[in-house]
Amino acid sequence: MDNTKEILTLAVEIGDAMLRCGAEIYRVEDSVIRILEAFGLDDFDAYVLSNGIFASANESREDACSVVRYVPLSATHLGKLAALNQLTRDICNHKCSVAEASERLKQCKNIPVYANAVQLLACGIGCAAFTFMFGGHLPEALYAFFVGLIEQ
């Protein structure tokens, strides 16, 4: 297969984006493996850690290639993660080519994050709601709201 490096790089980039969005390590590793299989690679290895991805293909042939990627910790973004999971499903169902998958990956990476004010407010409201849910009253909920703002 002449585009092995392109496929391997795409799979690792999708895994990188998933890790950055807060995906579990086993899910990222499984997704990378499934993507490589979906594009027809059969001689490959992929290993995912909490802050890195190691992948290689065609180790026994002349066109062997490897990709190592450091993935720094970042904030959780479930919207991006859902889009990346859908992209992985579409690749596994053979609904997109390598070029289409690369373009969709760029779109997934450009999904905007919520403004800090919205995130702070949501955290405060969530803390207050849990206070009510566990039997607290208005004074405790107000304290929880402000603690949620501070701790966010």
Where are these regions (language model features)?
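Cytosolic juxtamembrane amphipathic/interface segments immediately preceding
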Residues: 102-111
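A short glycine/serine-rich beta->alpha loop
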Residues: 69-70, 110-114
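Short, hydrophobic/aromatic alpha-helical segments in well-folded domains
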Residues: 14, 104, 128-129
